[in-house]
């Protein structure tokens, strides 16, 4: 009767079991699968592949062997996982676009940068690369510890000697449980120089280290933008860098431009990149590309992007950087196993741990060589004794019945050890010649000297460091190459929105009811004075264009409100609409408060500290403030000047500190004074009196007046004139001014005062939205107190709403007759 198994049921808490089992699994993944060792930079699978190849004799000087042979050896002896996982790891070690210095020398199809898979392992062949031999060098000299394999039938290395800093040289990437590592590759010579620097100066700082290790060096080259991300990663162990493809814009023989991409960011799939660009072109997310082709071959990479003749290649390239993998970020996480525990390391710590490992390797190798040398010297000492007493030794051996008796006799008679006695018995007769005796003596003396040197090394830390430096320098001389990845410090680390938008001249309009829009400056065609105009925008009965400026899509536009606050927006941030469209409410663009409206707009190309903003309020108060104080404006605005009760900001102009200012009023008065009469004030200051007003008068315009310019006035009934600047004498700030126009019921009160050089076009917009654009030179030059000429024909109930001077448009219309008044 067979024995029955006694059932044993053990109850356990499921939450405790889940916790324990998952922790065991997590630690197994962390320690035995996903993370590299800081000493050799290898994960277990990579270490096992190299060890198995070395065991099979597949060194760099031997013929290639089938990859399947290697995979079988690895999974059969050391790595209890699937063959595909091992083969994929080996393939990566043989890819020059994945490893900065390949550890496997592959023969056959090992994949491509297009994402093509490697051929099956039964077709490909491999052997160790020359540099991977340095990872295993001295492995037979007791330099490392061994451990049992998964079933206890074999022994495998815990770590490799790694005679160069592989962790930083080839990098590593892996996802464990609750943590991940992503270490970029580096240039071999630079990393070795870093190790040497740490060995010579243990107190070296990260900035000092970065003088010899400027940053990562990727196998696919490319460009790293800026050093701040590199430094942060090196100092803290974590950081992010931006990698950009190397692209150039070249001119074709037909005059068109093309973009040539010759290097890609690390781990970017070329085929998918080209597909993505094609998708963007097809979906019209990027316009201006006429052709896209891959001209890469065995000599190098070359992606050609043909550009339409009227398109801007720089803008298209910036869009490609922004929307495709031509520019990517690489998150650095210097996580590695230190004494079996995962730790985030700084650059210096990585180098220190490697240096400590090499000290152990050199000491263990030296101790091994010392043991070997002492053992050999011990034997030679016995042989020397035998040769010194040759006749007695021969007689003893001849008279001994057995080898055991002879060995015992030698030990007792000549005070030898058992090993020495055995060596004498094993010695061939030819070694009794005089020449052989000299060789034994020479070998013994050299061993005595070697033993002294080895003991000196073990007793002297400095000697160990010297050996490390010498051997690292020798490896650098053999394997060093040129840096591939360029670190760009002069360009932007990130692409700004304006880099994706072509610079173009635009007109920005703002209506009385607060609708803003932009449209190309070319939308408006030039007409002659007295024309009927074209419809400039769609308005209703209670809205009209109040502000109009000529600017650029890349300029910063400052919006000043009636309450003395300033807001900002880029030209391209203002939505573009057609000529007759109203635009969008300003509150959708700026965070203006209730009861606040925009009544001055200034375009700024650069916030130069030598430039000023000159302010004038409705009640004649003026202020001058440096433009640089307005460089940083919050989304909810900034106080531009403090207003007195019932006052409003009327006008703002950009000056250089040396200009003449004119201020015009509704009742036809104008004052001219140097801007230096108004001292420079802080941003929130209230200002000083610019012009003295009567109770029923308000300011309608403030301008900068050049010497050879003219003063332009426009009245509410559409009349206007130009008057030479010299007719307005300079007064002191705060005066009442001079009469500048004859005000009648026919022409109405002043609505605008402008300064012109005769190089502009004049835009007039009525309250109903009718717009006319005319050459400023078509307006008559008359005296200071004249009434002027009709500039625009309007219905009886119409009036001029706003006036602006814009860049001249050369397109002309037929002249219409001038009507003098």
UniProtKB/Swiss-Prot annotation:
It is found in: Cytoplasm. Gene3D superfamilies: 3.30.1360.40, DNA gyrase/topoisomerase IV, subunit A, C-terminal (2.120.10.90), Topoisomerase II, domain 5 (3.90.199.10), Topoisomerase, domain 3 (1.10.268.10). It comes from the Bacteria. Its main location: cytoplasm. It catalyses: ATP-dependent breakage, passage and rejoining of double-stranded DNA. Its EC number is 5.6.2.2. Pfam families: DNA_gyraseA_C, DNA_topoisoIV. The keyword Nucleotide-binding applies. A motif (GyrA-box) lies at residues 527-533. Signal peptide: none annotated. Coiled coil: none annotated. The active site is at residue 123. One of its GO terms (cellular component) is cytoplasm. Residues 35-500 form the Topo IIA-type catalytic domain. GO terms for molecular function: ATP binding; DNA binding; DNA negative supercoiling activity. Heterotetramer, composed of two GyrA and two GyrB chains. In the heterotetramer, GyrA contains the active site tyrosine that forms a transient covalent intermediate with DNA, while GyrB binds cofactors and catalyzes ATP hydrolysis. Belongs to the type II topoisomerase GyrA/ParC subunit family. Few gyrases are as efficient as E.coli at forming negative supercoils. Not all organisms have 2 type II topoisomerases; in organisms with a single type II topoisomerase this enzyme also has to decatenate newly replicated chromosomes. A type II topoisomerase that negatively supercoils closed circular double-stranded (ds) DNA in an ATP-dependent manner to modulate DNA topology and maintain chromosomes in an underwound state. Negative supercoiling favors strand separation, and DNA replication, transcription, recombination and repair, all of which involve strand separation. Also able to catalyze the interconversion of other topological isomers of dsDNA rings, including catenanes and knotted rings. Type II topoisomerases break and join 2 DNA strands simultaneously in an ATP-dependent manner. This is DNA gyrase subunit A. It comes from Bacillus subtilis (strain 168). The gene is gyrA.
């Amino acid at each position: 009767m067979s024995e029955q198994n006694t059932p044993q049921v053990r109850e356990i808490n499921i939450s405790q079991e889940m916790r324990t089992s998952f922790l065991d699994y997590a630690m197994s993944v962390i320690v035995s699968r996903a993370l590299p060792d800081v000493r050799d930079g290898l994960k277990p699978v990579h270490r096992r592949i190299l060890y198995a190849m070395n065991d099979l004799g597949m060194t760099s000087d031997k013929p290639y062997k089938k990859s399947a042979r290697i995979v079988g050896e690895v999974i059969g002896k050391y790595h209890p996982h699937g063959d595909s996982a091992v083969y994929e790891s080996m393939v990566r070690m043989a890819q020059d676009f994945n490893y900065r210095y390949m550890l496997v020398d592959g023969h056959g199809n090992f994949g491509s940068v297009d994402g093509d898979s490697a051929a099956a392992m039964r077709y490909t062949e491999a052997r160790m690369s020359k540099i991977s031999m340095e990872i295993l060098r001295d492995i037979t000299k007791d330099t490392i510890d061994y451990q049992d394999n998964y079933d206890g039938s074999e022994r495998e290395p815990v770590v490799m000697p790694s005679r160069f800093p592989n962790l930083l040289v080839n990098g590593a990437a892996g996802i464990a449980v609750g943590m991940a590592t992503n270490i970029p590759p580096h240039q071999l010579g630079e990393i070795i120089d870093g190790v040497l620097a740490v060995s010579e100066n243990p107190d070296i700082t990260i900035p000092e280290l970065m003088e010899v290790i400027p940053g990562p060096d990727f196998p696919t080259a490319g460009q790293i933008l800026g050093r701040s991300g590199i430094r942060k990663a090196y100092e803290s162990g974590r950081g992010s860098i931006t990698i950009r493809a190397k692209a150039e814009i070249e001119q074709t023989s037909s005059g068109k431009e093309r973009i040539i991409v010759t290097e890609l960011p690390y781990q970017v799939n070329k085929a998918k990149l080209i597909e993505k660009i094609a998708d963007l072109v097809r979906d019209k997310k990027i316009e201006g590309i006429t052709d896209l082709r891959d001209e890469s071959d065995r000599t190098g990479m070359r992606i050609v992007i043909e550009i339409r003749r009227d398109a801007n290649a720089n803008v298209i390239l910036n869009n490609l950087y922004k929307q495709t993998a031509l520019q990517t970020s690489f998150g650095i996480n210097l996580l590695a196993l230190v004494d079996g525990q995962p730790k985030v390391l700084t650059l210096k710590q990585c180098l220190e741990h490697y240096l400590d490992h090499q000290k152990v390797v050199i000491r263990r190798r030296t101790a091994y060589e010392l043991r070997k040398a002492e053992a050999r010297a011990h034997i030679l000492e016995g042989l020397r004794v035998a040769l010194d007493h040759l006749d007695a030794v021969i007689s003893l051996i001849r008279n001994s019945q057995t080898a055991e008796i002879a060995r015992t006799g030698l030990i007792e008679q000549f005070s030898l050890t058992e090993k020495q006695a055995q060596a004498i018995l094993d010695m061939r007769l030819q070694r009794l010649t005089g020449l052989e005796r000299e060789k034994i003596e020479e070998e013994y003396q050299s061993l005595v000297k070697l033993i002294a040197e080895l003991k000196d090394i073990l007793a002297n830390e400095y000697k160990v460091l010297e050996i490390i430096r010498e051997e690292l320098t020798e490896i650098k001389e053999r394997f060093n190459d040129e840096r591939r990845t360029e670190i760009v410090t002069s360009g932007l680390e990130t692409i700004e929105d304006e880099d994706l938008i072509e610079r173009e001249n635009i007109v920005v309009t703002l209506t009385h009811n607060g609708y803003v829009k932009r449209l190309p400056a070319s939308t408006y065609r030039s007409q002659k004075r007295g024309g009927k105009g074209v419809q400039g925008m769609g308005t209703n009965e209670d809205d009209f264009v109040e502000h109009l400026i000529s600017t650029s899509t890349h300029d910063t536009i400052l919006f000043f409100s009636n309450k003395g606050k300033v807001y900002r927006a880029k030209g391209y941030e203002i939505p573009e609409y057609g000529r007759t469209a109203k635009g969008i409410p300003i509150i959708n663009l700026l965070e203006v408060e209730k009861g606040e409206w925009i009544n001055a707009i200034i375009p700024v190309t650069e916030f130069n500290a030598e430039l000023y903003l000159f302010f004038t309020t409705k009640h004649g108060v003026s202020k001058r403030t440096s433009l640089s104080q307005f460089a940083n404006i919050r989304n909810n605005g900034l106080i531009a000047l403090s207003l007195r009760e019932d006052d409003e900001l009327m006008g703002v102009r950009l000056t250089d500190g040396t200009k003449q200012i004119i201020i015009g009023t509704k009742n036809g008065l104008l004052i001219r004074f140097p801007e230096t009469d108004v001292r420079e004030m802080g941003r929130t200051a209230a200002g000083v009196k610019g012009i003295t007003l009567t109770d029923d008068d308000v300011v309608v315009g403030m301008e900068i007046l050049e010497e050879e310019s003219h003063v332009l006035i426009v009245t509410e009934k559409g009349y206007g004139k130009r008057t030479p600047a010299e007719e307005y004498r300079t007064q002191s700030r705060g005066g009442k001014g001079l009469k500048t126009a004859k005000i009648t019921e026919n022409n109405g009160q002043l609505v605008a005062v402008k300064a012109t050089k005769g190089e502009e076009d004049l835009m007039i917009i009525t309250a109903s939205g009718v717009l006319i654009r005319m050459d400023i030179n078509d307006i008559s030059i008359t005296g200071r107190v004249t009434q002027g000429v009709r500039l625009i024909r309007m219905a009886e109930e119409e009036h001029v709403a706003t006036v602006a001077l814009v860049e001249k448009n050369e397109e002309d219309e037929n002249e219409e007759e001038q009507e003098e008044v």
